[in-house]
Amino acid sequence: MVERTQIINAVTAAITQAPERKFQESIDITINLKHVDMAQPKNRIDETILLPQAIGVKKIAVLGKGDIVSQARNAGVDLIIGPDEIERLGGVPREARKMAGQYDFFLAETAVMPLVGRWLGQRLGPRGKMPQPIPPTQDITPIVERLRNSVKIRSKDRLNMSVKVGNTGMTVEEVSENIDAVVKRVVGRLESGELNIRSVYVKTTMGPAVKVM
């Protein structure tokens, strides 16, 4: 497994080599795989990872009616969509696509999942954003709190994937801790573990890519 010092050195280099900007830049990593058959769906990476260091609040939408709506309001979610609105959005593809792009995570009570699949599945599914089903008695507050500080990493059918792990307003150690968490999670999903990792790079929005491993 990659040593933390390697990660710290790479993050430091990525930040120092980047052109100076007057705005805060994102810091992303790209993980390149090898010897993985991505034609097999079981080998594809699709993980939601809770980061040890927060990188900015994620936007969360809740779909449903009744008790989950009051829970969603109390949890401070960014958007609540009722059954009628689900159906309406399904008839306005452009608006549905915009909504799918604006929000990071979706939760839906189990009762409306068939509606979601019918009307919004084409917009959410390809983005890996189909809602997490919520049973009637489940408290969504801890789920919302966890997702606020989580990222989603997906390979689809490719041998590479990228994800945001921080920003230039964070310390090198904080960003490095997040990178460590993401890499370990991906390695844990691979059949041959670290042997399936070709390389990992880190970069700021406008800066050059620096090799981590």
From Swiss-Prot:
State a single Gene Ontology molecular function.
Answer: tRNA binding
Alphabetic keyword roster: Repressor, Ribonucleoprotein, Ribosomal protein, RNA-binding, rRNA-binding, Translation regulation, tRNA-binding
Gene3D superfamilies reported in the protein's UniProt record: 3.30.190.20, 3.40.50.790
- Entry's Pfam families? Ribosomal_L1 (PF00687)
Give the record's GO CC terms.
large ribosomal subunit
Q: Which NCBIfam families match?
A: PRK04203.1 (NF003244)
Q: Which HAMAP family match?
A: Ribosomal_uL1_A (MF_01318_A)
- The protein's name in its UniProt record: Large ribosomal subunit protein uL1
Species annotation: Methanocorpusculum labreanum (strain ATCC 43576 / DSM 4855 / Z)
- Record lineage: Archaea, Methanobacteriati, Methanobacteriota, Stenosarchaea group, Methanomicrobia
Q: Which gene encodes it?
A: rpl1
